[in-house]
Structure formats: C-alpha cells, structure tokens
C-alpha cells in the first residue's frame, strides 16, 4: 500500500497518518526526516543537500527525489508507505511518478482530507477565546491570521495537485470535519471500496 495524504493545516493529517501506519503496517515517510537522515548519513544526495542548505538555499526537487529514491530501497519501505510533505506541486508529483515507475511501483491512492476553512478558523478563534478566558497563554500556532495565510497558501499550491491526481483516478476524498474516529473509519472505507491492496501483514486494531 503506497499512499499520499493531503489536507490543509489543522485538518488532522498527522493523527490520521499515524493511524494508517499502525492499522496497515506501513511506514510514514516524512521528507524532513528523510532529508535530515540523508545529511547525517553522508549519502551523495545528503551531502549535496547539506551544501545547499549551508548556503541558505532551498533543496531542489531533484535532490529531494534522490533522497526519496534512496529511502525506498530500504527494507522497511518494501511493504508500503505513506508520504508526508511531498509532493506539494504538480512538477513534484510528476517527478514522483517517474521515480516510482523506474522502480516498477505506483501510488495506490491519494487521500484528500477536505475541510471547511471557515469552520477551521472558527475553531481556532474559539480556542483562543477559551484560553484567554482561563488566563492562560495562547499557543503560537493558535493564530487565526496566520492560519488564514497558511490556508490560502495551501489552496494555491494544492488545488492543481488535487486536479492532477483526480484526472489520473487516484484521488479519494474524505470529510475531514468529522470526529477523528469517524475520519479514520471513512479513510478505511474508501480504501476498501477503491480496491487498494492491503499490506501483506494485514490490518490491525488501533
């Protein structure tokens, strides 16, 4: 089972990714973690990334793809994975498809957690009001203005990506505004219905 999970800030991607990992016996591949591991290990692409970051530059897509390629060769990735933080753009999605094809692999599904942005913002505003009323310090990430900017950025980047995967028949959409357990159940339901192959280890309870 090879998956991508898409969703805006506040949609609960982290929670659902961990539940997928546990339930299906696959691994979560975070581009940030893979990048740091490659740099620490001193791999060729890791050293290239290190030089770029040391000069203050952004790591280009081809280097990230190289790091993902190396990671997919490791034994624990053979039975499936969920990609976290990549792709974010259509060119990255195209590069990922080419990489997977070169390894005789393919994505099984791209799960989009669809949310009501105004409801997300209202949740944050309510949380800020409740925290302030208790005389407690508001968390740095509980900032409606910052969240609004992040949502706009996500929407601009991701809408073309969602179209890309929808046109290729890989997109599965789940209502991310439901309770956490209901979202989890719906993800499993759409995966079963779409015929996505399960991990060879089967499924587990959470």
UniProtKB/Swiss-Prot annotation:
Record flagged with keyword Nucleotide-binding: yes
CDD domains recorded: ADK
Residue ranges of the region described as NMP: 30-59
Residues that coordinate or bind ATP: 10-15, 127, 178
One Gene Ontology cellular component: cytoplasm
UniProt: AMP binding residues: 31, 36, 57-59, 85-88, 92, 139, 150
Entries under PROSITE patterns matching the protein: ADENYLATE_KINASE (PS00113)
Catalytic activity, as annotated: AMP + ATP = 2 ADP
Region (LID) residue spans: 126-142
Keywords: ATP-binding, Cytoplasm, Kinase, Nucleotide biosynthesis, Nucleotide-binding, Transferase
InterPro entries: Adenyl_kin_sub, Adenylat/UMP-CMP_kin, Adenylat_kinase_CS, P-loop_NTPase
Main location: cytoplasm
UniProt-listed GO biological process terms: AMP salvage
Disulphide bridges, residue numbers: none
Record-linked Gene3D superfamilies: P-loop containing nucleotide triphosphate hydrolases (3.40.50.300)
MF terms (GO), sorted A to Z: adenylate kinase activity; ATP binding
Protein's UniProt keywords contain ATP-binding: yes
EC number annotated for this UniProt entry: 2.7.4.3
Biological pathway: Purine metabolism; AMP biosynthesis via salvage pathway; AMP from ADP: step 1/1
Subunit structure: Monomer.
Note on domains (UniProt): Consists of three domains, a large central CORE domain and two small peripheral domains, NMPbind and LID, which undergo movements during catalysis. The LID domain closes over the site of phosphoryl transfer upon ATP binding. Assembling and dissambling the active center during each catalytic cycle provides an effective means to prevent ATP hydrolysis.
Purpose: Catalyzes the reversible transfer of the terminal phosphate group between ATP and AMP. Plays an important role in cellular energy homeostasis and in adenine nucleotide metabolism.
PANTHER family: NUCLEOTIDE KINASE (PTHR23359)
Homology family: Belongs to the adenylate kinase family.
Protein name: Adenylate kinase
Native organism: Nitrobacter winogradskyi (strain ATCC 25391 / DSM 10237 / CIP 104748 / NCIMB 11846 / Nb-255)
Gene encoding the protein: adk
